[in-house]
């Protein structure tokens, strides 16, 4: 991503913008403008894909924050966004790892003292609902009476609901099976579920390993942006450490810029951690994910 073009991995700014501001889930301007911090260490979560993984593996992110006297501690890997939100609210981590906004909103609605600090948009939008080639499921309407693995209150469930609504399928006619990604993949492979709603790289690996195909692809079949990648911390941490939050936001922005300018190298880094095939990696390189 060039400095002149944020249309791909577009940082929508700090929490003064985006859906957090619309929902009243951000700090006031005065809080963001306050100087200082009460800690020199930030505990960040990471998973086996995405911006935080690349930041952790490359090391440039930590060096940039070290210039401000900030030490980074990495916690993980986590399978998806929701457990990182639990780590933040439980006090064992300071930031969620940059995941789906849907579980974040669900947590806030349930009373978690979280605030958004930053939003990211990825292109292409590759979240998909897939089924094995031998399943007889070829379109959304074929899901009636079938079971679909989704992560509860996460992007997988959100996409499935959107697909059913678009195709006018009553959600009560489809069985939602709540599984985290590490459990959903073998469930699809063994036939314990009929389909899986999932994001990259899990969905891409499953297509090849389990001979699966798309029923519904977000970027192709959905006309609107269904979700944002979001970062959250507790309101207390943000209020006490606004300078640190700004520094972390800036460091992630710099990492995103590097990824957009070095997408092929980034894919090799992601593959090493994700342990998927060269074929999947080469597909990602061809996509020029940003």
Walk through the language-model features, giving the residues of each.
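Periplasmic-binding protein-like
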Residues: 120-131, 212-238, 245, 287-289
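Short, glycine-/small- and polar/acidic-enriched structural segments
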Residues: 34-170, 175-178, 194-200, 215-216, ...
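N-terminal secretory signal peptides and thylakoid transit peptides that target proteins
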Residues: 2-19
